[in-house]
Every structure is written in C-alpha cells, then in structure tokens.
Regions:
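A conserved regulatory-domain signal marking ACT and ACT-like small-molecule sensing domains
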Residues: 4-5, 14-199
C-alpha cells in the first residue's frame, strides 16, 4: 500500500502544476549595486524563471528587460514583488506572445556620419515609411580619431512580415545617403538568420 501511495504522488504533483505563460518585465531607474540581484530574487520567490534578459546603462540610468516564464496566475503578484524590491525604479510588465511569427524579411542596418540634429529621426522615419520595423537599435556618438568632429553611428535590425522589394529599398537608402551626407549599409539575412532575429 505504501508503494502504491508513493507511486501516485508524482502524478498528483503533475496534475496540480499551474500552466506557465511568458511575461516581459522591464525595470528602469538609477544604477546601483545589487539591483539585478534584487530583481531576480523577487522573480524567483514567485516561481518565475528568467528565460532571456538584456540590460544596459546610459549615464546614471540603468535599464533591464527580461522574458520571464511563470504561472499564468502569478503575473500580477510577480510584477508587484519586483516593484517592491526596487521601489525607486519604474517597473512595467506585458504579456508575451508565445509564438513569434518568422519575418518574411530581415536585414542589418548600419549608418555612420558626422553627428547632427535629427539623424535618428530621419533614418527611422524612412524605415517606417517603407513598412519596416526596427527590432533592435543601438546608437552612439564618439570623438573622431584626430579630434574635432563628433562621429555618429546607428546599428539596427529591420524586420517585415511581408516580402520587401530589396532593390527599391536599396535605392531609397542611396537617395537618403545623398540627401543627408551619410554612409548607409544594408545586409539582408537569409531565412534561417531572419528567424533568429525575430526570436
């Protein structure tokens, strides 16, 4: 009888296990030591598992985004616990779609030029007008090797759920180069790489 009871316990445990779903949790605020530890401890205490994360600091401000897997009924409590763990920071959470559709088009975008006002706005406006979205974007400004001019660079990944006329897009970027006096490089990913970019 004891053996039968023990054998049934794992089955009972499986039957009561909560369904899992994914949540994107973002934390933004002043950088300080132990911040990541405080956030991840709060998540773990609510049986959350950090599947993927990305963090960076700009000046004194720290930003972190995490894809968290947790019980579907734990999302509100988990978000509240993270906010309590870092009361001086802005915490937001959004339900994540479990299935990300593979894009029909994906390409890397690199822009470099002398720094100037409105560069990011103009480039991203062109990308949006072409029906593309930017899944990743990084910009920076640094001094030229021999001093004087500030150099600007932008790197990103463009995605589209629809097929794109690559020749037309390339011509558009060439026109933008001439208009703005910038260097623009576009590298189209193959299908396998496109799936990775969307993940």
């Amino acid at each position: 009888k004891m053996l039968a009871t023990r054998a049934l316990r794992p089955l009972a445990s499986l039957a009561t296990r909560r369904p899992l779903s994914q949540l994107v949790v973002s934390v933004v605020g002043p950088d300080r030591g132990g911040l990541v530890s405080s956030v991840t401890r709060a998540i773990a205490q609510h049986d959350g598992n950090v599947v993927e994360s990305s963090s960076f600091s700009i000046g004194p401000v720290f930003s972190m985004a995490m894809l968290v897997e947790a019980g579907a009924d734990q999302h509100a409590a988990l978000t509240s616990a993270v906010q309590s763990a870092v009361p001086g920071h802005s915490v937001s959470a959004h339900e994540a779609e479990e299935c990300v559709e593979a894009p029909a088009f994906a390409a890397a975008l690199d822009v470099s030029c002398a720094d100037g006002v409105g560069l990011i706005a103009r480039v991203t406006e062109f990308v949006a007008n072409e029906g593309l979205s930017l899944s990743k974007l990084e910009t920076k400004t640094e001094g030229a090797p021999h001093g004087g001019t500030q150099l600007f660079s932008l790197s990103g990944v463009m995605l589209s759920k629809d097929r794109v006329n690559e020749a037309k897009l390339a011509r558009g970027f060439k026109d933008l180069e001439l208009e703005m006096g910038v260097n623009i490089d576009m590298c189209v990913y193959d299908d396998a790489e496109a799936v990775k970019m969307a993940a």
